[in-house]
């Protein structure tokens, strides 16, 4: 939301959500800067050194003309998952919930009622703990146990590849910071 509303880019703290280090965003900034590679490189260097950057007025104007932005925190994400499940009988993942919530914000702000399609790229089963809590269930267990619990509560099918994890031994216990991944 900061990129759109104030022209700022900040490193996002949530895992898998650091969209500021993205070749797609770099390409967008490159296009909006008039293909000024030095300017875009400066933004990426500022992001690496200071954790943020502020785009030029020219880029800001291009962003304002092309995009509408909103934000959706964890509480609103959970509320959206729960509401979609209760009202529509449809189980959505955390990423889709953010999209749905921001779409609703957009409609409220603009009056636009055009039909909308969400392309969900994640499964609710990838986020069992969060999804269970969002639909009012206390997660019981971890790993495959949560897959089974979400299935038992909702009747939705566990994705085949996740179901195939039953009985498998954990192969890796290593983790590292993303900056250490060379």
Locate the predicted segments by residue.
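C-terminal non-catalytic interaction/assembly regions of soluble proteins
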Residues: 98-182
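C-terminal amphipathic alpha-helical segment
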Residues: 16, 21-33, 37-40
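Hydrophobic alpha-helical scaffolding
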Residues: 1, 14-21, 67-71, 89-92, ...
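Active-site-adjacent helical/loop segments in soluble small-molecule enzymes
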Residues: 34-113, 177
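Single conserved hydrophobic/aromatic residue that forms the stacking wall/gate
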Residues: 2-8, 12
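Conserved active-site and cofactor/substrate-binding residues in soluble primary-metabolism enzymes
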Residues: 19-27, 72-79, 94-98, 122, ...
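Glycine-rich, charged/polar anion/phosphate-binding loops
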Residues: 13-14, 103
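Buried hydrophobic packing segments
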Residues: 1, 24, 28-31, 99-106
């Amino acid at each position: 939301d900061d990129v759109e509303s104030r022209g700022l880019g900040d490193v996002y703290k949530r895992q898998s959500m650091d969209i500021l280090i993205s070749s797609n965003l770099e390409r967008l900034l490159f296009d909006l800067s008039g293909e000024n590679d030095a300017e875009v490189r400066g933004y990426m260097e500022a992001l690496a050194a200071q954790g943020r950057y502020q785009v030029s007025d020219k880029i800001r104007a291009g962003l304002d003309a092309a995009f509408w932005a909103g934000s959706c925190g964890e509480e609103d994400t959970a509320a959206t998952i729960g509401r979609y499940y209760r009202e529509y009988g449809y189980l959505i993942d955390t990423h889709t919930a953010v999209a749905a919530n921001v779409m609703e914000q957009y409609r409220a702000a603009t009056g636009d009622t055009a039909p909308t399609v969400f392309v969900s790229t994640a499964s609710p089963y990838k986020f069992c703990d969060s999804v269970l809590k969002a639909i009012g269930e206390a997660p019981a267990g971890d790993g495959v146990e949560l897959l089974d619990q979400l299935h038992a509560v909702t009747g939705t099918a566990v994705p085949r590849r996740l179901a195939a994890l039953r009985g498998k031994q954990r192969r890796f216990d290593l983790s590292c910071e993303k900056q250490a991944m060379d």
